[in-house]
């Protein structure tokens, strides 16, 4: 990803065909060593292509990928009715989870980056 980002940075900066040297210079400026094999792979895949077209194709491909969420789960026939003694224990666990969750939310100063 760092090689693609560096390539895009160079291309958006006006260099229509960044070389390995250009990308290494960008990576070195932030203290990242470049792996020549990966770097050459990225350059060979992107060289001569219009960056806007590549981004548009990528967005189209990402739009077709399902992004989690609704998974249908069916319970086994015998597990539909839980035992009567387990209900209070489940309620107690939920209280503990809410308590822990509120403590964690204080750590991120209310931003909820991964919520």
From Swiss-Prot:
GO terms for biological process: cytoplasmic translation; cytoplasmic translational elongation; translation at postsynapse; translation at presynapse. The keyword Hydrolase does not apply. The modification N-acetylmethionine is found at residue 1. The modification N6-succinyllysine is found at residue 21. The modification N6-acetyllysine is found at residue 21. Residues 91-101 have a biased composition (Basic and acidic residues). Plays an important role in the elongation step of protein synthesis. Belongs to the eukaryotic ribosomal protein P1/P2 family. This is Large ribosomal subunit protein P2. The gene is Rplp2.
């Amino acid at each position: 990803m760092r090689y693609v980002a560096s390539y895009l940075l160079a291309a958006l900066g006006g260099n229509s065909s960044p070389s390995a040297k250009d990308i290494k210079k960008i990576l070195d400026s932030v203290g990242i060593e470049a792996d020549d094999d990966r770097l050459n792979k990225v350059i060979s895949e992107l060289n001569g292509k219009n960056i806007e077209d590549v981004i548009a194709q990528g967005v189209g491909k990402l739009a077709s990928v399902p992004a989690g969420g609704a998974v249908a789960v069916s319970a086994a026939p015998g597990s539909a009715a839980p035992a009567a003694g387990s209900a209070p224990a489940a309620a107690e666990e939920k209280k503990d989870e809410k308590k822990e969750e509120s403590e964690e939310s204080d750590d991120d100063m209310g931003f909820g980056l991964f919520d």
